[in-house]
Design a protein with these regions (language model features):
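Short, charge/polar-rich alpha-helical segments
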Residues: 35-46, 112-126, 218-228, 278-292
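Short flexible linkers and secondary-structure junctions
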Residues: 17-115, 237-241
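Sec-dependent N-terminal signal peptides of Gram-positive bacterial secreted proteins and lipoproteins
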Residues: 1-17
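Sec/SRP-type N-terminal targeting helices
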Residues: 43-47, 75-105, 130, 155, ...
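Charged, solvent-exposed structural "stalk/scaffold" segments
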Residues: 52-54, 58, 79, 83-86, ...
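Coiled-coil heptad-register positions
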Residues: 53, 60, 67, 74, ...
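Membrane-embedded hairpin module used as a gating/binding unit in multi-pass transport
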Residues: 195, 199-207, 221-247
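Short, solvent-exposed, mixed-charge loop/turn linkers that connect secondary-structure elements
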Residues: 175-217, 348-361
Length: 361
């Protein structure tokens, strides 16, 4: 099933600006481009890479000076050791920052995708609440007449009225939640007025994922090796070991080596936690698949019931209001199904992305 929707942020019923001009559209891809462009983290990484480039040029000059033939002095060996360490350090720092840039971009993609989904869901929820409130208002009008002629009790009438008031309060909460989501999205995009834009929904096609135990284990291992925290820790451990090997450490060398062993053990534990996190994500995906299949079954049953009720309505066996209620129930199942498919595909993208898979421990 291909779920393709366009959800507007120009609906006055939920507090969006209304304009006679042709609305501007904002795609997910464009939003990611803006988020990356505005990212202070990525700008900071770029500055670090520029600094590394400058440092490497200075190290090249030092290397040339130490390589001049005929020059020899007692400290030269220490200078070479320090130079080798500095070259290795800058090389690792460069690779780490390049990795960090890729990681940050992937995380931004993940964040913007989730915010697009959350905003769309909130817009659809508000539209759904509008329909439910309209139906409940009709129900209240009917109940008022029935109460006036003694067909229902005051308690029944008040219950319907209270339910309607509760729906209105929930709708207001949803509206405030939507405003919060919009502010969060614009924190990354920095547009002058996000309400001027129509967000183009990301299409999702429901495709269940199936992995063998070996494939799942392999994915978990790869994810544990590409996690940002793991890579950063390994980088630090490697540099500390190099300091020890080059006799550049201060203090007790044995204690320094023990610190390296401890850090290695901690990193192994972190990798194990990430692998377990990946497996939990996969288990949750399979549970969501079951929920989607159940919703699909309930949808088909509800459609059949609605067809039967249409026949009963024709012969006066049920009221038109009952048909409207059943249509609302079917609409709610359709919404739940669509929402579950999107949530599944979002979770699947997160799972398949080695940079972030298993990171929500």
């Amino acid at each position: 099933m291909l779920v393709t929707l366009v959800f507007t942020m120009a609906l006055t019923s939920i507090g969006f600006a209304q304009t006679k001009q042709v609305p501007k559209t904002l795609s997910y891809e464009k939003a990611v481009e803006l988020a990356i462009k505005n990212s202070l983290d990525i700008k900071q990484i770029d500055r670090k890479l520029q600094k590394i480039e400058t440092t490497n040029k200075e190290l090249d000059k030092t290397s040339e000076r130490l390589s001049i033939p005929g020059i020899d002095y007692p400290e030269k060996e220490d200078d070479w050791n320090q130079l080798l360490y500095s070259l290795e350090k800058e090389d690792k720092e460069k690779k780490l920052n390049e990795f960090s840039a890729r990681y940050t971009k992937r995380m931004l993609e993940d964040t913007i995708r989730n915010l697009f989904h959350s905003i769309e869901s909130s817009v659809l929820d508000l539209q759904d609440y509008d329909q439910q409130i309209q139906l409940k208002q009709k129900e209240l009008q009917i109940a008022k007449v029935r109460y006036s002629v003694g067909k229902i009790s005051r308690y029944d009438y008040d219950s319907i009225k209270t339910s309607l008031e509760g729906m209105k309060r929930t709708k207001e909460q949803k509206r405030l939640e939507l405003q919060k989501q919009k502010l969060e999205l614009n924190k990354y995009l920095r547009l002058n007025n996000l309400d001027e834009y129509t967000l183009v929904s990301i299409p999702y096609q429901y495709q269940p994922i199936t992995l063998t135990d070996a494939e799942l284990n392999s994915h978990a291992v790869r994810a544990s090796h590409t996690n940002m925290d793991v890579v950063a820790k390994e980088n630090g451990i490697s540099l500390q070991q190099l300091l020890i090997d080059q006799n550049l450490v201060l203090g007790n060398r044995k204690i320094q080596q023990e610190d390296v062993y401890i850090a290695n053990t901690e990193n192994l534990k972190l990798k194990e936690d990430i692998r377990e996190g990946v497996k939990r994500e996969y288990a949750n995906l399979k549970l969501t698949e079951e929920r989607i299949e159940l919703l699909l079954y309930r949808k088909e049953v509800m459609k059949q019931e609605l067809q039967n009720d249409m026949v009963r309505l024709k012969y006066g066996k049920i009221s038109k209001f009952s048909i409207e209620e059943k249509k609302m129930q079917l609409s709610e199942l359709e919404r739940q199904y669509t929402e579950s498919v999107k949530e599944y595909e979002l979770a699947k993208i997160h799972f398949q992305n080695l940079y972030v898979s298993g990171s929500n421990l």
